[in-house]
A protein has these predicted regions:
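A Zn2+-metalloprotease active-site environment signal
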Residues: 6-21, 29, 36-218
Length: 218
């Protein structure tokens, strides 16, 4: 896809090189490690669900933890094409959702996109590279370690700029769910449901985020 003429977003935070917290991403009171991710990948094979969907499902939901202090962002280097690319993708999602919200008498609140390496504090606990990209409803921010894109090519066999952009659009889809109150309603339903039904609701949330990403991509 071509982003040559697309503006860049003003909502990019570059925290790379600032270190970060440790101990895993804590969401909904729990922590997930690589073993959990491995199980998720196996489950995705048998259920026929995209592995990225399962990983995102496991890294979402629950009540946000207390926000940790975040390092001050710094300007994106001029010679960092991938960072400028995701900034343009974010701007493209802003243009799409601002127009859709405006057409429906609502005002869209732009999310922030945080670039980090290794680990970083979030309102949902400590985010780590191993978890892949994720959205934190507690601070309305999307988090990504750009090293994930190499994994996207080699591990998930999804190369190309559209696949890279779609990752951002999917997480922004979770932001839209949050703004519309969908996420809260699903979480309330999960609290009343059994484990199987709660997991099914999480999968539906991920599939809807995929659908919302498709709204941007069409």
């Amino acid at each position: 896809m071509r982003m040559d003429d697309q503006r860049e977003s003003d909502n990019l935070e570059d925290r790379r090189g600032d270190g970060g917290g440790g101990g895993g991403l804590r969401l909904g009171g729990g922590r997930m490690g690589l073993g959990t991710i491995a199980i998720a990948l196996v489950a995705s094979y048998f259920l026929g669900i995209n592995p990225l969907t399962v990983i995102n499902m496991l890294s979402g939901g629950g009540m946000p933890a207390m926000e940790q202090s975040a390092p001050a962002p710094h300007p994106v280097p001029a010679n960092d094409p991938m960072a400028h690319f995701v900034s343009k993708v974010l701007a493209s999602t802003e243009d799409t959702w601002r127009e859709i919200f405006r057409a429906n008498g609502k005002q869209y609140e732009d999310p922030k996109l945080v670039l980090f390496s290794g680990a970083t504090p979030t309102a949902c606990g400590t985010g780590q590279t191993a978890m892949g990209p994720f959205y934190c409803p507690g601070d309305h921010k999307v988090y990504i370690d750009l090293a994930f894109y190499q994994e996207l090519k080699t591990r998930f066999h999804a190369p190309g700029e559209f696949a890279e952009a779609y990752v951002i659009a999917h997480e922004v889809g979770h932001h839209v769910q949050n703004l519309l109150g969908i996420a809260d309603k699903v979480h309330q339903a999960q609290q009343r449901a059994g484990k199987v039904e709660a997991n099914a609701l999480s999968v539906r949330m991920e599939l809807q985020a995929d659908c919302l990403a498709g709204v941007w991509g069409k």
